[in-house]
């Protein structure tokens, strides 16, 4: 059996740019890519917390330390500057590998300040 698992996630980053006329993609600060394990040119899903839209594109690197999250091309219709989004990538693996897999998650606040990283998502409690 093959399973699709969360590979990496940027939780609650703020969109800093939205460029309808750029070729496409989502530019992400290289530090953020490193923290989440997301690679340049990797397929990503973006879930807009602000407006509820969900869309797919691919990641490109933005300048390290810039805190840039730039949604580009047609995807710019799905996000505006200031929107809070979650960016995720996924990986496929065997059922056996999935049993011990841990994603790389980076948590953000304010103006894209990385507050912490984790190898698991906390258990939701009542």
Swiss-Prot record:
Consult the record and explain the modifications the protein receives after translation.
Is synthesized initially as an inactive proenzyme, which is activated by self-cleavage at a specific serine bond to produce a beta-subunit with a hydroxyl group at its C-terminus and an alpha-subunit with a pyruvoyl group at its N-terminus.
EC primary class: lyase
How is it regulated at the activity level?
Cleavage and activation of PanD is accelerated by PanM.
Q: Which GO terms describe its molecular function?
A: aspartate 1-decarboxylase activity
Question: What does the record say about how the cofactor binds?
Answer: Binds 1 pyruvoyl group covalently per subunit.
Among its keywords, does the record have Coiled coil? no
Q: Where in the cell is it found?
A: Cytoplasm
Record note on quaternary structure: Heterooctamer of four alpha and four beta subunits. Interacts with PanM.
Quote the protein name from its UniProt record: Aspartate 1-decarboxylase
């Amino acid at each position: 059996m093959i399973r699709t698992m969360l590979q990496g996630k940027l939780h609650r980053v703020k969109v800093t740019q939205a460029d309808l006329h750029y070729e496409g993609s989502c530019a992400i600060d290289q530090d953020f890519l490193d923290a989440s394990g997301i690679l340049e040119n990797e397929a990503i899903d973006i879930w807009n917390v602000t407006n509820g839209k969900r869309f797919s594109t691919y990641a490109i690197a933005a300048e390290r330390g810039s805190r840039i999250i730039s949604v580009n091309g047609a995807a710019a219709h799905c996000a505006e500057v200031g929107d809070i989004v979650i960016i995720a990538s996924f990986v496929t693996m065997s059922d056996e590998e999935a049993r011990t897999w841990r994603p790389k998650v980076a948590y953000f606040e304010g103006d894209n300040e990385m507050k912490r990283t984790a190898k698991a998502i906390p258990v939701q409690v009542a």
